[in-house]
């Protein structure tokens, strides 16, 4: 995979448009989780340091396309950047016909989804974005799987299109985990539904030596041979789960923590999976299962983690995810983690500095794991050939 990297270019005096992923949660006008902005800062700072005239843009939330809506403005992000950058920062609301940027200044272009045609990868809009810059930098791995005007179209028409350091690092880390992993490789796939992760499971069983399943996905595997009561599982996928279990190395939980209602205060009872009653639901790994999975992780050389193994938001059903998370953190393996709930678990257990690589992408992370081509990356590869 060959793309032009931002680090290969001389940006001095150039107009540089960086497409970052600054889609962060905002409450009462304040950024409540800054992980994505922090991940994007080194790219912005590197361009400013080179003496470029830097513009950065992103989407935020899901506004009605083509309409300005203050609720989805990038202003809270601008205020955050003002606090964390030495350079002057300002927000530009109307920029499609051109914007003046001083050297050493950062101009944040308002939410791209306020522009009609953004999601449809509209060619006219893409050309307007491209006319703003001498160099377009795609640095938003989290949206690399969407062909949109600010992530894909603009790159076709900008004088130069390159990958930013964050995007390059994401692709390198995922490539290391999936293309030539040190073995044994263990994947952890959690979450509520087999149906949404079926393609991921199908890909991973062919790459990994062991795939650990958790959450509602694991319940579907448990349901092959057991009553799962009122647990979240997918009856339609039991046969597919059986086929995967029989063909590949997927250890199925042997015990679990169950509750009689899905609530934060529901008491947890430790049970063998063969003993679950009709009025109970499985909400976490039991100790035996969690420790067995931790042993597999301890022996791993490569770990890919996507999704918690239980309802970790509820303190009574957190232990399984914590044991697995700490096993990954303590492992000497190269570990890569991705997905919103996974990042929340990493945050909760304070193990951020013990994971080798934390991916900023959710959907893009999964599509890459599935082996799908990411439109933004394909575009960058094509531009590199020109």
Swiss-Prot record:
Record pathway: Carbohydrate degradation; glycolysis; pyruvate from D-glyceraldehyde 3-phosphate: step 2/5
- Biological process GO annotation list? gluconeogenesis; glycolytic process
Molecular function via GO:
ADP binding; ATP binding; phosphoglycerate kinase activity
Q: List localization entries.
A: Cytoplasm
Q: Which domain of life is it from?
A: Bacteria
Taken from the UniProt record, the cysteine pairs bridged by disulfide bonds within this chain are none
Enzyme category, top tier: transferase
Xref: InterPro entries:
Phosphoglycerate_kinase, Phosphoglycerate_kinase_CS, Phosphoglycerate_kinase_N, Phosphoglycerate_kinase_sf
- The residues the record assigns to binding substrate are 21-23, 36, 59-62, 113, 146
Q: Which Pfam families does this chain map to?
A: PGK (PF00162)
Which residues lie in coiled coils? none
Q: How does this chain assemble?
A: Monomer.
> Record's family?
Belongs to the phosphoglycerate kinase family.
Protein name according to UniProt = Phosphoglycerate kinase
Q: Which organism was this protein described from?
A: Serratia proteamaculans (strain 568)
Name of encoding gene: pgk
């Amino acid at each position: 995979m060959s793309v032009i990297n931002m680090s290969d270019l001389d940006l001095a005096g150039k107009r540089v448009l960086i497409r970052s992923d600054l889609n962060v949660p905002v409450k009462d006008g304040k950024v409540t989780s800054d992980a994505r902005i922090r991940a994007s800062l080194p790219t912005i700072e590197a361009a400013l340091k080179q003496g470029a005239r830097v513009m950065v843009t992103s989407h935020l939330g899901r506004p009605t396309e083509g309409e300005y809506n203050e609720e989805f403005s990038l202003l809270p992000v601008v205020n955050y950047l003002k606090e964390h950058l030495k350079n002057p920062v300002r927000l530009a609301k109307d920029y499609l016909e051109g914007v003046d940027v001083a050297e050493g200044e950062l101009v944040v272009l308002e939410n791209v989804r306020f522009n009609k045609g953004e999601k449809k990868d509209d060619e006219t809009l893409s050309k307007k974005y491209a006319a703003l810059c001498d160099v377009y930098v795609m640095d938003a791995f989290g949206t690399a799987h969407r062909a949109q005007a600010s992530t894909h179209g603009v790159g076709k028409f900008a004088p130069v299109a390159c990958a930013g350091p964050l995007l390059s690092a994401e692709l390198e880390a995922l490539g290391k985990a999936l293309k030539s992993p040190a073995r044994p490789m263990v994947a952890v796939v959690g979450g509520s539904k087999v149906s949404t992760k079926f393609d991921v499971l199908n890909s991973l069983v062919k790459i990994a030596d062991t795939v650990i399943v958790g959450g509602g996905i694991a319940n579907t595997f448990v349901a092959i041979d057991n009553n799962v009561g009122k647990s979240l599982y997918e009856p339609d996928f039991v046969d597919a789960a059986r086929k995967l279990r029989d063909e590949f190395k997927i250890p199925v939980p042997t015990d679990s923590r169950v509750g009689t209602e899905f609530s934060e205060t529901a008491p947890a009872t430790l049970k063998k999976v063969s003993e679950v009653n009709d009025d109970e639901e499985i909400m976490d790994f039991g100790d035996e299962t969690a420790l067995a999975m931790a042993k597999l992780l301890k022996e791993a050389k490569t770990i890919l983690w996507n999704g918690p193994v239980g309802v970790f938001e509820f303190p009574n059903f957190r232990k399984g995810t914590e044991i697995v998370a700490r096993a990954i953190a303590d492992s000497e393996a190269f570990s890569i983690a991705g997905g919103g709930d996974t990042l929340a678990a990493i945050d909760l257990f304070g193990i951020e500095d013990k994971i080798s690589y934390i991916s900023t992408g959710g959907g893009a992370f999964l599509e890459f794991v599935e082996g799908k081509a990411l439109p933004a990356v394909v575009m960058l590869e094509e531009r590199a050939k020109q």
